[in-house]
Each structure stands twice: as C-alpha cells, then as structure tokens.
C-alpha cells in the first residue's frame, strides 16, 4: 500500500507577511489552539498566564492588539458563557436557559433560550486549556484556527481569494450578543471559515474597533485565500479598491477586466 505523504508544512510567518502585503492589515493576525491538558498549554514557549479574571475577548485581544502569547483555563474566564463557547464548561440546561440575559439582551426567557441554543460551541469534555498567539511567532504550530480582523473592504477581498478556485457560497449567521460563537466557536466546531460581526462585548472588553469584522479559519483555508488573492491581484483585483467615480463612464473601467471576454 502506498504511504500517504504528510501534510504540507505551512510557513506561518510568510503567510502573515503575504496577508499584510495584500490587505494592509492594521491588527495582528493570530492563531488559537485548544489543548487536552493544561501541561501542554503551559509548555508553549514564552506563554503568559493571566493574573486576573477576563473574558475570552480580552484574551484574544492580548494577542491581536498587544502581540502576546497567552494561555488560559476555565478558571481564568469570567463566567459560563465564555467557557462554554470554547468547550471549557458544559452546555447544560442552566447554560441553555440564559437567565442572566433576560431583561438585558432579550425581552423574555424564551428569547434568551433561543439565542443560547443558536450558539455554535466546542463540545465539552475534550479540552482543558486554550492558547492564543501572533501567527507569525510560530509558537502554536500549527494553530487550530487563525483569526483575521479586517475592514469590510479587506474582508471581501479575502473571501474572494477563498472563492477563486473550488468555489463555495458562504452562508453565515448572526447570533447577536456572544458573536464569538459565530467566529472562533463555529470555526473550532466545524473547521469551516467563519465570519462574524464582533459583538458589544468584543468591542467593549476586547477593544475591537468599530470598522473591523472578524474571520476565523484554518491555516489551510488561510493559505488558500492568500493564493487566491495573489491571483486576483495579477488580474487587477486588489486592495485597496480604488474608487472609480460615481459619475464616470463605466465602460473604460469595466473594459480593463472584461474587454477581451
């Protein structure tokens, strides 16, 4: 029987350099990795451990805004919501009730429960720890997922890159509050690229700017997007997208791409 070749080793630092060249990103691209034991997490080089209680949003932003490598367990997080999304607490009946959100984010217990049931979460019982780190550091090699914060204009070019070959229509949802379930929760659960509009908590506690969206995707999907974006750039479809002029004759601009078609 023919032996299968090992998966291709990705140049994570090179991928980040390509991303920054293609999209001019403001925010550090990071990796996220789950661990079955705390010891595996603490063995990561130069890992920091929190000395206070945080939201997962804050931990993620310590990597994406400050460039830190940070590891956590359930005890480092503020409550069941943060823990449950990443599989560090059970998604039990108490979690599904969402009592804390009634009269805050939702008008009735029924609404709160529907939201809780709609969340994409990592199954409980497999992992005990999580770490985040700048992707270019290579400390999480490989990470389970990569997190890319980008403006809408940058994000659509990245998505176009993913769709350049092997086209797939992406259908994403918006749970509202706890939007981290739309990004890293869904990507960790399904392995699929997952786009989100960062929620109130991510912006208040994680410091995500108004103009940024978030996509979580595997290193392989990110590499595919980069390959696609490079080809798009050769075709004249690149970031920044230069405004053509709302009153200009569009034929010259369209002709650059489609005249020979």
Residue ranges with predicted function:
Residues 1:
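Cys/His-clustered metal-coordination modules, chiefly Zn-binding fingers
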Residues 5-261:
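Acidic, serine/proline-rich low-complexity intrinsically disordered regions
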